[in-house]
């Protein structure tokens, strides 16, 4: 068996990617494929925590465009992450991997409330943990939730899964075919150049806590497994100058 590069990670999954080709809702085939990779990583002995977005159902800024109050729109997105988390939990548990969903907003009939020590204990017991409902507050993205949870559980890295984009570019490669890809970039460069890795709050949180970010295309064949093993799938590493 190959030796994984990380012992404990936060895997940030794009919500939009869960919709597959439909572009909205959930694609069972995508869920199953992701669950199989998560199981493979789990079976290597890696402690896996997951944060999933909600772009397949809702985006807060969409609500703003409709004239909604920003906080209300963000709360809707927060609830959508819970739907995604439950769907992913079901897919993973069908592969006989114990999985816990922990929410930042209490909904005890649905999932456990997030308690830091309990989350770490679940990971130590070999369970996959899915963090849902963002940070529990409006105005914060699921990227910020991933950075916050990674700091709280002392994860060795955030594996930032993107849909159809290999790593970090100086501009959107889906729009600009001359976009230049970075193999490695610092937190400071991400902030100064406004590179679309994660929002500034999340990037600053990772920088302050020295949490490396690995940006990769989560839809490539076995890319999650390969990234955990340290194999090259075209990913970009975001870290400090001395990391």
Swiss-Prot record:
One of its GO terms (cellular component) is cytoplasm. SUPFAM superfamilies: Carbamate kinase-like (SSF53633). It is found in: Cytoplasm. CDD domains: AAK_UMPK-PyrH-Ec. Keywords: Allosteric enzyme, ATP-binding, Cytoplasm, Kinase, Nucleotide-binding, Pyrimidine biosynthesis, Transferase. GO terms for molecular function: ATP binding; UMP kinase activity. Coiled coil: none annotated. The keyword Cytoplasm applies. ATP binds at residues 12-15, 55, 59, 163, 169, 172. Allosterically activated by GTP. Inhibited by UTP. Its main location: cytoplasm. PANTHER family: URIDYLATE KINASE, URIDYLATE KINASE PUMPKIN, CHLOROPLASTIC. Catalyzes the reversible phosphorylation of UMP to UDP. This is Uridylate kinase. It comes from Symbiobacterium thermophilum (strain DSM 24528 / JCM 14929 / IAM 14863 / T). The gene is pyrH.
